[in-house]
Amino acid sequence: QQEKGFNPFQFGMMAASDSHNASVPVEEDNYTGKIGVDATAESRRGGSFINTQSSLYGASGLAGVWAHENTRPALFDAMRRKEVFATSGPKIAIRLFAGDYPDSVSVSGLASQTLYHQGVAMGNSVGPERLINNRLRLYVWAVKDQQGHNLERLQIIKGWYEDGELKEKVFDVACSDGTAPHPNTHRCPSSSAAVDLSDCSVELNKGNRQLATVWQDPNFDQAQAAFYYARVLENPSCRWTTWDALRNDWPLLDTVPATIQERAWSSPIWYQP
């Protein structure tokens, strides 16, 4: 952008399963492979395709769109303005705004009219006119998949250029179970939500159905361009390879993790000084 005057990477976030077998394997416990040759548990466990081990594939991905109404024109308008998000499979919903928002919000968040009137939605750029006391304020909200696992934490990922090098920093901004990010490390406490690998059961009383907060960048420099996007993590749950192993009485693979944390990502907001 400094050299050409525009940003060719100003994209919205989308995701998909990249499946070639006419199935929609969005659930880890219902994964049926992607390309036909990995249609059985045996082939998924030890097979490969184009020099990639089948066991390394993620089960799925979904695209989400924040449209004003459920019509074809409204959906395409939302995609053009990049008010979209991506998930690793579950129907988690997430949204991100930047603007003149109050210091704190309830977990149910702010009204849509307030969000749009006092700020800009994900996928857009924001300038100094939206700063409060020379600080950028972001509102982020997420709600769990109603048939999925509870949420563990909300994060903001910040990126900026410094001395010609791209820098990134991850901030935990909202934590589950009444905890809060550490003021120095900006990290939530480690999740205590356990997964029983003998049957893939999880602790249902851990985590939140929704998370929301207004966050202010503690290292904000109003003269420095930056991007921000939100990420939300579910509590840990079994990966599809673990489900295959349990159903076939196989040992767990040591080349992939037994559990994962499903997640969703918002489109970025770009700060332009």
Give the predicted meaning of each segment.
Residues 1-273:
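C-terminal functional module detector
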